[in-house]
A protein has these predicted regions:
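Hydrophobic faces of well-ordered beta-strands that scaffold small-molecule active sites
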Residues: 6-8, 39-43, 92-94, 116-118, ...
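Surface-exposed, active-site-proximal loop segments in enzymatic domains
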Residues: 16-21, 50-66, 178
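Generic structural signal for well-ordered alpha-helices
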Residues: 25-30, 73-80, 106
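Active-site-adjacent pocket scaffolds in enzyme catalytic domains
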Residues: 96-194
């Protein structure tokens, strides 16, 4: 209706499909590209069978915290190649699964030509004791900034070429929450009830 364009962050796991199913997926994604939508990369090493098959290895964690630069760089480079092989594009936007970016991931993104990341959830950290660990608790900015190659949460020393476009967050009764449609419905229901 409004001809709005969107970025779809894609896990390369979809490329683990075979034959007719893979063709169907690729055709759907190519139709999005024809409509001028963007396909970005969404990283989930632990559940991405296409990535695991390409690297001939299983990974146990979502969070970048559990991987070194070399591993992260390999994930990003291989996933980018999978997207190019299947869709003929080189993605330039990125979101780490479960918002679990870290400083090594920022370096890998820059080294692989990514221009935009959208993993930050300012003021929020979670899954501190499991494989989906993420921490954006030091960030209190809700506007875009260039990521730091020294500390991914540092919004002042913007020395990378990767622009962070954070996910909207808000404070509610002393707790920082993602601006998520589910929360909107829950908050509306709570206000209606009380």
């Amino acid at each position: 209706r409004y001809n709005a364009k969107a970025t779809f962050f894609l896990s390369t796991n979809c490329f683990s499909a075979e034959n007719e199913e893979l063709n169907k997926i690729n055709n759907q994604l190519k139709s999005l590209l024809k409509e001028k939508h963007e396909i970005g990369l969404h990283m989930h090493p632990d559940s991405d069978l296409a990535l695991q098959n390409a690297l001939n290895k299983k990974f146990d964690y979502t969070s970048s915290k559990f991987y070194n630069y070399s591993q992260i760089n390999q994930f990003v480079k291989t996933s980018k190649k999978l997207i190019h092989k299947n869709l003929g594009i080189n993605p330039t936007s990125f979101r780490w699964g479960n918002w679990a970016l870290n400083t090594d991931a920022v370096k890998a993104l820059q080294d692989n030509g990514f221009k935009i990341d959208s993993s930050a959830t300012p003021g929020i950290k979670g899954h501190l004791n499991d494989g989906m660990y993420y921490d954006w608790s030091k960030v209190d900015e809700n506007y875009p900034w260039k990521l730091s190659l020294n500390d991914y949460q540092d919004t002042k020393h913007q020395n990378s070429k990767v622009l962070e476009i954070p996910i909207a967050t808000f404070n509610f009764m002393g707790k920082t929450l993602r601006a998520d449609p589910v929360y909107s419905e829950l908050l509306k229901a709570a206000f209606d009830y009380y």
